[in-house]
Amino acid sequence: AATLAASIMAVCYDNQDHPEYQNLTNVFYFITEMCSDYRGALPLQFYIDSLPEEHPAKILLAATKVAAMRTRSSFYVSAIMTLKLLTIPAINQMSNKSDFDIGKMIDEGKKIIIYLCLPARDKTYFPLASLVLRQLSDLIDYAADEKYGGRVPVRWNFVDDELGNFTKITNMRQQTSFGTGKGIRHFMFIQSYAQLDDVYGEKVSQI
């Protein structure tokens, strides 16, 4: 997780003048290029050494130098596998920029529906939808605190049909507890609570 977070930070910070490069596909290629052996060393180490002290990714990336090489390799492989879906051209094109502005939608307060349609027969792309839902809730949460005193003016309703058959949404616990006060409400449609236990664990599913 630290390797992935640091790589995202590096790609975003180093491309402040080129927002079109600030996407997860480029994070994938950053890791694969920086963490491949080159003349007995990793380019990532030279990159870390070249960073100014004020670079936000320096400390996060420097932490990887402490681990043994075999352990580091497992970090890099894990990060690459997490992002592998984003190398598919169609997914890259879809995910490298947004077609709508959530901040603008919150400000305008108009009625709108965002559909996420996924085939039940194949869960390959479910993690991407989980990521979208996580980002949506984060943006609503941020807008609530920064612009509206803690709660957005118009409530956002998430209709979670067949949530028990869906991949884990990493901040679902926060969304269903603290999120209600921010203007985020979830309607969960499941076949049994055992499904939620399987995905989120018994403690979280009971919330």
Q: Model regions: which residues?
A:
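P-loop NTPase motor domains
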Residues: 1-184
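Conserved ATP-driven motor cores of ASCE-family P-loop NTPases powering translocation/secretion/packaging/pilus
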Residues: 176-207
